[in-house]
A protein has these predicted regions:
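Hydrophobic, aromatic-rich cap/lid helix
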Residues: 165, 175-199
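Conserved hydrolase catalytic core segment
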Residues: 87-126
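Conserved alpha/beta-hydrolase "acid-adjacent" motif
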Residues: 220-226
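Active-site loop/oxyanion-hole signature of alpha/beta-hydrolase fold enzymes
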Residues: 43, 52-91
Length: 264
């Protein structure tokens, strides 16, 4: 494990594997170098690229500095790009895709960008519900009361839409619930990145990086709509649908698609 110092002095933990052109992986909510899709995805991509896998601030072995703002997370990614040599490919998943798109719109030196299912809400009923909810405030209230588990449940049920019975069962999965609770304090960060979850059309229009927007063919309709809308909003973006995949995309299916895009 190594660290890079972000602009505000926060130490960001990362590990590097493989050789070739640099590729930085950006996790979604509750995930880290040790938990989520990246531990399986990174070694596959490292067969072709020099992969940088990092703990977003407040997670894993990375430090945290208050007050939080999404601009600080963009600066974290900027520091990693500097560590990688000054420019890099970037792959973001879920809310990490939202962060990666914000970074590209901010002008970071991203050679090419691939994003998987940024969870924007573009259908009227979905966007109205999320705009009214003020998820960031709800999460901050629960965390201020020390209710980490309830914050995770709120995220899973009210934001992601996981059925209550599955959330209940997750509490009894060895090693899973404890990891989710450990990262719960960063849930407001992902809520801040996504805002009211509406499609930030003007911001996406500022992206000048070659971009591939990817979605799963079996994902929920709201996510498929978000992927299509994001691909339209980013200038000259490519759209790719992975047959049979959901929001929890299989690393062995995603790897060849992003490899082909970055290597072209």
């Amino acid at each position: 494990m190594s660290t890079v110092i972000s602009r505000d002095g926060t130490a960001i933990a990362f590990e590097r594997m493989g050789s070739g052109s640099p590729l930085i992986l950006v996790d979604g909510a509750l995930c880290s170098r040790a938990f989520g899709p990246m531990p399986k995805l990174a070694p596959l991509l490292a067969q072709t690229f020099r992969v940088y896998m990092y703990d977003r601030r407040g997670r894993g072995e990375s430090a945290d500095t208050r007050p939080y703002s999404k601009e600080r997370e963009v600066e974290d990614l900027e520091a990693l790009i500097g560590e990688a040599g000054g420019s890099a490919f970037v792959l973001g998943l879920s809310s990490g895709a939202g962060l990666a798109l914000e970074a590209a719109a901010s002008g970071l030196a991203i050679e090419k960008l691939a994003v998987y299912e940024p969870p924007y809400m573009v259908r009227p009923a979905d966007s109205a519900r999320h705009a009214k909810a003020n998820h960031q405030s709800q999460l901050e209230r629960l965390l201020a009361a020390g209710r980490r588990g309830d914050a995770v449940k709120y995220f899973m049920r009210d934001m992601v839409g996981v059925p209550a019975i599955f959330v209940f069962m997750m509490r009894f999965m060895p090693g899973v619930w404890s990891k989710l609770e450990a990262a719960a304090s960063t849930l407001p960060y992902d809520a801040a990145i996504m805002g009211d979850f509406s499609l930030p059309e003007q911001r996406l229009a500022a992206v000048r990086t070659r971009t591939l927007v990817i979605g799963g063919g079996k994902s929920e309709a709201r996510l498929r709509a978000a992927v299509e809308a994001a691909a339209r909003a980013v200038p000259n973006a490519q759209l790719r649908t992975l047959a049979g995949q959901t929001h929890n995309v299989k690393p062995e299916v995603l790897t060849p698609v992003v490899t082909e895009f970055f290597a072209a």
